[in-house]
Each structure stands twice: as C-alpha cells, then as structure tokens.
C-alpha cells in the first residue's frame, strides 16, 4: 500500500531517465521485433498485470541492474496490455520538457521505500488529444514444417532397406526369388545384375576368353543374282526345263563336302564329351545353313556334271590331332593329360586345327618327355627313399641295440646299488637288534639283581620280626602273670568295641537302605498303580530325604523332568496301550511326504487300510519295520531301546509320535 501511494511521485520523477534512455530503448525494441514468444512470456508473468490499463505507458524500473533495465525496456508495442514509454517524438500534447519536476520526497518517505524495487507501479492517466496508433498486424502463424519431410524420408529409407533385403533374400531362396522377380518392379533386373556381379567375381576370366576368341572368317561366296521373273507367282512353276534346288548341281556340293568332312571327323576323332559334340553339331548346322543361304539361283547354263566324276569339296577337310594316351597311373600326370586332351579337343572342333598341328605335336612330344622325366625322377626318388629307409632301419636297429645295452648296464648298476643298500640296511637292522637284545639283557640282569636284593632285605626283616616275636614270647612266658592277662583282656575289649561300632554302622546303613527301598517302591507304586497319571512329588521328596547327600540318588532325581513329578507320567501299561493307538495313526501317515496336502492324506489313509503288518525284522528303515521292533521291545520291557527306535521316524510319522516319545522319555528317566 505504501508503494502504491508513492508511485505517482516516482513515476513523474523518472521522466528524465526515460528521456535519456529513449534512443537505447528504440534500438532494443527494433532488435527484438521477431521475438514474440519472449514478449508473451513476459506479459503472462508480469506483476500487477491487472493494474495496467490500455492507454497507459509503462516506465522502466529503477533497479540499477542492467538485466532488469533491459527486460523492462524490451516490451513490444504490439502487446495489447503493455504500452511502450513515450519518446521525445511522441504525438502527445504534454511534452517531456513541459513536465515540472516533482518536489523532493521527505526523508521519512525515502527511508520507507526501498530504492532497488523491481515492481513497476501504475502511472496516473494522461490525457491524449490524438487517437492511439493501431497495433501492427500479428505475424503469420508458423507452419508445421518437417513432419511431411520426415515422413517422406523415413518412407524412402524403409522402402530402400526392404528392397535391398528382398534382393538379398532372393539370392538365398528360390521361392522368394520367383515372387520377388514377378511382383516387385525392377526386381528381376536387380537380381540379374547381382547374379552377374557374383559370376564375374567367381570367374573373372570367363568373359575375357569369350571376348578375345577370334571369329572364324566368313565365306561370303559368289554374288547372288536374282532374275527379274524369279519372284513369287500365282502359277505353279513347271518342272520341265526349270531349275530345282533339290537336284544335283553346284549348290549341292557344299552339303556333300560338309557331310564327308563330318564323316571323316567322326572316324578319326576320339570320343569327346557330349558338350563338345553339341558345339560341333551346332557349328556344322550353322555352316549348312550358311551354305544353303549362299546357294545362287541363276538361269545361266553350265556344263553338266557327271555323277561318276569325284567332286571337289567346297571346304577343305581339316586333319584332326590325335589326343594323348594315358602315360602313367600318377594322378598329377593324368590330370595334365586330361587338360592337354581338352585343349586338343577344343582345337579339333575349331577350323584352325591345321595351323596348330605342329605346335601341338611338339607340345605332345615335350609332354611325353616330361612324363618320362617325371617317371625317372619318381623312380630315383623311390630308390633314394628306399635306401634312406633301409639306412634308417639300420640306424634304428643300432640305436635300439645300444639302448638295450645301456638299459642292461643301468639295470645292473641299479641292481648292484640296491644290493649294496640292502646289505647296509640289513647290517643296520642287525646292529640295532643286537643293541636292543643287549639292552634287554642288561635290564633283565638289573631287575634280577634288584629282586635278589629285595628278597634279602625281606628275609632280614622277617628274621628280625621272628626274633622280636620270639623275644616277646619268651618275655610273656617268663612273666606268665596277671599283667599279661590284663593286656590280653584290654585288647579283646577294644576289638569288641570295634566290632560293635562296625555292626551299628552296618545296621544303620541297612535301615537307611531299607527305608530308601520302601520310598523307591512307593514311587514305583505311584507310577504303576493308578490308571491315570498323578503327581509323585511327595514320594520323591521322601526318597531325597532318606538319601541325604548321596550323589547318585541326587543325580538321578535331578535328571527327572520337573513336569513328570509335578503332573505325573503314564505307567508302562498305559505307554504300551497308547503306543498301539499311535502306531495305527503312524501307519495311516506312513505314506505321506513332508509337504503333503489333503489329497495325499486321503490317499495315505486309504492305502493304510490294505497294508499288511510285518513280522519282527532286525533290519529295515521303513515305518512298519520300526513300529514292529518298537512293539517287540515294549513287550520285553526295554523302554529305552523302544524310544530310540521310535525316534528314528521321519516326517509326519515322527510328528504324530512326538507326544508319545516325550512321555516315554519321562517314564524312562523316572524308572
């Protein structure tokens, strides 16, 4: 409230600062014309926005910070709620020079107002004579660019990857190859291009040989002249005197020559692969077609040719080159022979075989010489290898003999060493046994001498005792008086007193033992008489009182569980009866696992009905064997062993017999 009251005076006082900062504000405003979002953000969070009215100018803050002054000065003119401060060139009726300076504020007001406040107080309304300038039109909304371009880019990339993957998979799968080449545009061309690249990569010299193969010279033959009236006519030509290409003549000589040349080749040439025969037949067929095409059809008259006269072949016959025969059984030579025969076959199929006959003949001779040289080298190598093997065998035999000799020497040395060590050990043992025997003899002699000395000492003592007895006897006989008789009586009385005291102790012990036995019988009676367990603490106190400080009785009483004599324990017959009931329940649960459910309990209950009771068995860890042995031990009265047998149970069986085992242990401790 205090700031709002002081705001008018502060607004008038800041006109001078506004006038000084006018050019700077204009420059900042022009530099920030394109930042509409920043002005919106500032206008949305502008403090005291409700107090700013249209038509009022907002002055810059008095904060000395450059950032605050810049933020308040960069407000745009196109905001409807925020107006820029007036400049000296404004059309307002009130000029900045005509505004009077405000009076100085009082010291109290200056002290109450903080000079660094960043809040823009509202300015009092100013009267304007002219209408406010219209706001500039808003900039056009930004179009969402990039979505269609991004979609198109992703579509092109996806299509390219899918197309490349389809081409690659077409090379791997025949079914997909058919589908891809049939339904995908330009799929067949792409696959064929990749297959051609793969073929060129595998066989780089295939196309070079095809391209560099010389073309056979074509025989154009004579010039063909077609008469003017030799065309197609509606009238069938007459045979009389006419020219027929099926008759014997010059045009048939090429066919006869080709047939004879083919027959000669089939007779002289060896067997070739089917592929080469096919190539030759195709070549022959082509030549026949060419010869047929070269047949001149003229009406010129020539001398008749006799049928008996031998005809000159149109194409001279080519002598074929004989292939190489198999020289040796070596695989390498046979492979080379196959390669040379293949070359000969290819040359025979070509028309230039006569040109290469001499080089091939020389090559065959060189190849035969090479085969003989290889055979000779192999024989020499085989002989050298045999000799080397024989030498190796001899060396091996010599080394083996030397090794056996060394082994025998080492064995002999080891045997001699072992024998020497054995003799040394035997001597050591004999010496040690001699020492032991000598020591034992010395000890035996010492013991015998000591025994003799002891016997002599005992004899001396016995002789002294006899001497004293004899002296005493003689003295007593000599006295023979009343003193000797009194001493005898005194000794007899003392012996009687001793006997009396001993008998009194024996009688007292007998009485105590009898009372203790009666108390123990009372405890047994309390345990065995009643049909229901009852406390026997009184009987136990009587036994403890009669026993006194007897450690055995006190230890036995301390070993009894306090619950047993405070609440009572069942008798032996009750334990046996209860065992029979517990045994039935244990048999029912004998087939249950540890994590059994309701179905397992029901199954075990039904199976226990059809189980047979076993006889007494000394072995076996199953439930039935343990129950049988326990029942036998209870009938014999061996409660301790019966409890140990029942303690060997596991799982639900042990859980069901837990209470019976506790009573059994308490009864065993009490008895």
From Swiss-Prot:
Region spans: Disordered: 1-54, 70-144, 210-316
The superkingdom listed in its UniProt entry is Eukaryota
* Coiled-coil parts of chain: 360-455
Which ranges sit in the Mitochondrial matrix compartment? 39-150
Name a GO CC annotation attached to this entry: MICOS complex
Topology Mitochondrial intermembrane: residue spans: 172-671
What is one process in the GO biological process aspect for this record?
cristae formation
- Where is this protein's transit peptide? 1-38
Please give the chief subcellular localization of this protein. mitochondrion
Pfam families recorded: Mitofilin (PF09731)
Where in the cell?
Answer: Mitochondrion inner membrane
Basic and acidic residues bias (residue ranges)? 258-293
Skewed-composition ranges (Polar residues): 107-120
Keywords, in A-Z order? Coiled coil, Membrane, Mitochondrion, Mitochondrion inner membrane, Transit peptide, Transmembrane, Transmembrane helix
**Bilayer disposition of the protein:** Single-pass membrane protein
| Residue spans crossing the bilayer | 151-171
Give me the stretches of Pro residues compositional bias.
121-141
Quaternary structure annotation from Swiss-Prot or TrEMBL? Component of the mitochondrial contact site and cristae organizing system (MICOS) complex.
PANTHER family in alphabetical order:
MICOS COMPLEX SUBUNIT MIC60, MITOFILIN
Please explain the role this protein plays, according to its UniProt record: Component of the MICOS complex, a large protein complex of the mitochondrial inner membrane that plays crucial roles in the maintenance of crista junctions, inner membrane architecture, and formation of contact sites to the outer membrane. Plays a role in keeping cristae membranes connected to the inner boundary membrane. Also promotes protein import via the mitochondrial intermembrane space assembly (MIA) pathway.
Q: Which family does it belong to?
A: Belongs to the MICOS complex subunit Mic60 family.
Provide the protein name: MICOS complex subunit MIC60
Q: Which organism is it from?
A: Arthroderma otae (strain ATCC MYA-4605 / CBS 113480) (Microsporum canis)
